[in-house]
Design a protein with these regions (language model features):
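Active-site loops and adjacent core secondary-structure elements that bind or stabilize anionic groups
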Residues: 1-73, 234-459, 463, 484-486
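Long, charged amphipathic helices and adjacent flexible linkers at domain junctions
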Residues: 1-33, 83-125
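Flexible, glycine/charged-enriched surface loops at secondary-structure junctions
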Residues: 42-46, 53-64, 77-86, 103-116, ...
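Amphipathic alpha-helical packing elements
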Residues: 71-76, 194-216, 300-335, 567, ...
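Cofactor-cradling patches in redox/metallo enzymes
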Residues: 136-146, 151-220
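Phosphate/diphosphate-binding loops
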Residues: 182-205, 209-210, 217, 221, ...
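C-terminal accessory domains/tails appended to large, multi-domain proteins
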Residues: 413-600, 615-625
Length: 626
């Protein structure tokens, strides 16, 4: 009867698809098989059968259920089971426990019994101003699978709430997540507050914008207890286990401190050569503005696309980042042929498309956009946007930063302003802008699945919405190039679009070519994006819904993406003067890009109140959080 019990040497799902002979096993074997294979169809009836065989419900949880999840954890740790399968297993476990909970409550009332023991309490949150939580949610599921109590505070959680809840739940450690660069400063602030309030528990740092170097150099020095950077969900289990275990903790903490010391030493000894800002500007990217072709857009001003069909966006989806969400390495579609993850990738892809079919058929999520073209001219490292093509009145201006890092063989130091004709060139030039979202309704749908104990579908919804948002940005950029005349003869395939073989770029505020997230405020005001799309900016200038993308369009024939990287104080002073901000405020928003240590001794009383942004994610060309 056990011929189709789980194959502990690998994650094959053939048995689940082709045979039910595993149903002939003992109740313990059936429950273990269901957990390992992620089959929830029979778990309720099996759990009830187990309840008839065991004296207490707690024995079921601590017996066959935890035994099955232990196998799941072991296989995951050995690389024989993958994240999508672990999430399926978690769904089975949650359904079994949910069925037992009312019976357990009754047992506790009758006998004063204790609940199931857990290995520790892990509190996790996406920090203030940040709305991205796919990675955080995955970490929570994985830790729950390993019998840790997870207190998930959600997104945009302020420091006070995080620390108050940590005390309330007697947390054994705190995990902070974030995608946008301003979240890094918020993490530093939380660490400082933990030090001030004499916390003694480890602090874990994760998210796309974080790094081991930033954690070691900026966060760890502010908190005398253990601070660990966690790369991904699969590593989180080992880190938490090492910090919880009396046998493993001391050695892990020592090795972590050594890594931090090495990273700090490497950071201080870096040899990156930066030229003065004045020299970088003198060696800027140049264009023969007399001869270059400048195309005029079909229209000036903005257009709104409401309830854009998701079916149209499907053909523009780049699926490779979707597999990265599930920690499956490989590019689409070659990943399907991978000997290790190919079969799992096929299942993940099928699930995503099933969800997308349902979203489209039932109209569960809406896509909206606003985009436009405007008369523009560069003025030094600023881009002026005019009210109309008479160009007599400046409507707004975008502030740009310039490269100062002198790389080998480098001929120029670029700024986005270089791609727009200067005021004194005698040429009429233009700039475009856009805000798109494919997330209207996505959070509500994901939360519905969470209430149904279906973490897998909740994560799929969020990840698919992110892919659709990026696809919308790609689709709209194609449309914009055609309406700007220069892209009318394009015949690119989706693979060509993903490879960016077309002319023109669409850089996003907060990413390498324009690292200042606050420039989104200018774009949103120009396009009236809150009113037209429903997309808003948080206090840290993250976009909500999270499945949103925004940026500028540049049509220059030689425009390409680049990284500003680190900048010196002389450029920061110029930038602050142009924005009308204090140097200290600019330093705060651009702290990851500073090539020097700012003077934080004096309070900054002249900084703008960024809470006013509230009423209003990653690849370098967008802000989708991918």
């Amino acid at each position: 009867p056990t011929t189709c019990m789980p194959d502990l040497n690998g994650p094959s799902m053939i048995c689940r698809q082709r045979s039910l002979c595993w149903r002939e096993g003992t109740i313990e074997e059936r429950m273990q098989h269901a957990l390992i294979k992620g089959i929830d169809k029979y778990i309720t009836e099996d759990t009830e059968e187990a309840r008839q065989h065991y004296d207490r419900c707690l024995q079921i949880i601590e017996g066959p259920l935890m035994s099955g999840m232990q196998v799941v954890g072991d296989l995951f740790g050995e690389g024989k089971m993958f994240l999508p399968q672990v999430v399926k297993s978690a769904r089975v476990m949650k359904k079994a426990v949910a069925y037992l909970e009312p019976f357990m409550e009754e047992e506790k009332r009758e006998a004063g019994l204790e609940g199931a023991s857990q290995r520790g309490t892990f509190l996790i949150a996406t920090v203030k101003g940040d709305v991205h939580d796919i990675g955080k949610n995955i970490v929570g599921v994985v830790l729950q699978c390993n019998n840790y109590k997870v207190v998930d505070l959600g997104v945009m959680v302020d420091c006070d709430t995080i620390l108050e809840e940590a005390v309330k739940h007697n947390a054994d450690m705190i995990g902070l997540s974030g995608l946008i660069t301003p979240s890094l400063d918020e993490m530093v602030y939380v660490a400082r507050e933990m030090q001030r309030l004499d916390f003694k528990i480890p602090l874990l740092i994760g998210g796309a914008t974080t790094s081991a170097k930033h954690t070691a150099v900026k966060i760890a020095p502010t908190y005398e207890n253990t601070v660990v950077h966690v790369n991904d969900a699969s590593r989180s289990v080992g880190v938490v286990e090492s910090l919880i275990s009396d046998d493993l903790r001391d050695n892990f903490v020592t090795e972590n401190a050594k890594k931090h010391a090495q990273l700090v030493s490497s950071y201080r000894e870096r040899t990156q050569k930066l030229v003065p800002y004045e020299e970088a500007f003198a060696k800027r990217f140049s264009t023969d503005w007399e001869s270059v072709t400048i195309d005029e857009p079909d229209f000036l001003g903005s257009k709104v696309l409401d309830d854009f069909p998701l079916a149209t966006l499907r053909e523009f989806i780049d699926w490779s980042p979707y597999f990265m969400t599930w920690e499956l390495k490989g590019k689409y579609p070659k990943i399907f042929d991978d000997a290790v993850v190919g079969e799992v990738a096929k299942e993940v892809y099928a699930k995503a498309n099933e969800m997308l079919d349902r979203i489209i058929d039932e109209k569960l999520i809406q896509a909206r956009a606003v985009y436009g073209f405007f008369p523009a001219a560069s003025d030094g490292d600023d881009i002026l946007v005019y009210s109309d093509d008479e160009r007599s009145q400046v409507q707004t201006r975008f502030h740009c930063l310039r490269q100062q890092w002198e790389r080998r063989g480098q001929k120029d130091f670029r700024s986005l302003a270089d791609y727009v004709a200067p005021v004194d060139s005698g040429r009429k030039d233009y700039i475009g802008g856009f805000v798109v979202t494919a997330g209207i309704g996505a959070d509500e749908l994901a939360n519905q699945f969470k209430r149904e104990l279906d973490d897998e579908s909740a994560i799929v919804v969020q990840a698919v919405a992110d892919r659709c948002a990026e696809a919308f940005a790609e689709c709209l950029h194609q449309r914009a190039r055609r309406e700007w005349q220069y892209g009318q003869s394009e015949t690119f395939s989706n693979e060509d679009l993903i490879s960016e073989k077309y002319r023109g770029i669409r850089p996003a505020a907060g990413y390498p070519a324009c690292p200042d997230h606050t420039e989104k405020r200018t774009l949103f005001d120009l396009l009236k994006a809150e009113k037209t799309t429903g997309v808003e900016l948080t206090s840290s200038f993250a976009m909500t819904p999270a499945a949103s993308v925004s940026g500028l369009y540049f049509a220059h024939p030689e425009a390409r993406y680049f990284a500003v990287d680190r900048v010196t104080r002389d450029q920061i002073e110029s930038y602050a003067q142009r924005k009308g901000w204090s140097v200290a405020e600019v330093e705060r928003w651009l702290s990851p890009n500073l090539a020097y240590e700012p003077d934080n001794s004096a309070p900054d009383n002249s900084a703008p109140d960024n809470s006013a942004a509230a009423p209003t994610g990653s690849c370098p060309k967008c802000n989708c959080g991918s």
